[in-house]
A protein has these predicted regions:
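Thiol/disulfide oxidoreductase modules built on the thioredoxin-like
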Residues: 139-141, 150-202
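Conserved redox-active cysteine motifs that mediate thiol-disulfide chemistry
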Residues: 82, 90-107
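Active-site-proximal beta-strand/loop segments in catalytic clefts of secreted hydrolases
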Residues: 90-92, 122-125, 148-149, 190-191
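Structural microenvironment flanking redox-active thiols in thiol-disulfide oxidoreductases
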Residues: 100-141, 151-162
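Extracytoplasmic
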Residues: 61-63, 81-83, 114, 170
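Sec-dependent signal peptide cleavage junction
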Residues: 1-60
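N-terminal "domain-start" segment that seeds a small globular fold
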Residues: 43-78, 150
Length: 205
């Protein structure tokens, strides 16, 4: 069994919405352009937990790094969340199943953030930061929302995660559970009830 198949610890269903794929030429041109993004604020640090009681499992895949912006323009990479258990969810403001998951993520964050849980919602193809912020405020989202610095970074990050795990990038929501050592230990293609996330998260806290 290949590594891509083995993170079939992957759960999949039809409770997804297809995401449009940007043209590769546009992504390539933005990739070189974004190397010199101006006016970046310093990468922010999140509070870190030093627990190391992560269950050991075979064929874990290292989570790809990323460089994305929060809704205030602060730049984050994956190391900003080092030492925490991360639920990284790719979603869209236009996606019905994604919206249904938000209340469960809010509850999870409230309950487990003090134990080292960080929830990161990467908004894909969801318009400007201002539009996403209005959406976030309306739903009272309390966890970290990240999006493009300039253009296409969010989709490129989605592509990186979909590629290393083999789940693809054609549909949202897609969520990845990352342990304290930075390995992807579970993936979910499609919306899930909160009870599934609670069950799977607990052993890693």
């Amino acid at each position: 069994m290949s590594k891509k198949q083995s993170v079939a610890n992957t759960e999949a269903d039809n409770n997804v919405v297809k995401a449009k794929v940007p043209k590769s030429r546009k992504i390539a041109s933005q990739r070189s352009k974004n190397k010199n993004v101006k006016n970046r604020k310093p990468i922010q640090s999140k509070k870190q937990k030093n627990k190391t009681n992560t269950p050991k499992s075979l064929d874990k895949i290292k989570a790809p790094d990323f460089l994305l912006s929060d809704l205030e323009g602060n730049i984050f990479d994956l190391s900003a969340f080092s030492g925490q258990v991360i639920m990284l969810t790719f979603w869209g403001t236009w996606c019905g199943p994604c919206r249904r998951e938000i209340p469960d993520f809010i509850k999870l964050y409230d309950e487990y953030n003090d134990e080292g849980l960080e929830i990161i919602g990467v908004a894909v193809q969801s318009g400007t930061s201002e539009n996403i912020k209005r959406f976030s405020d309306y739903y009272k989202i309390n966890y970290t929302i990240l999006t493009d610095i300039d253009r296409y970074e969010s989709y490129r990050t989605f592509h990186d995660y979909g590629t290393v795990t083999g789940v693809g990038t054609r549909a949202v929501p897609t969520t990845f559970l990352i342990d304290r050592d930075g390995y992807i230990v579970k993936t979910y293609r499609g919306a899930r009830p909160g009870s599934v996330f609670y069950r799977d998260l607990k052993p890693y806290l």
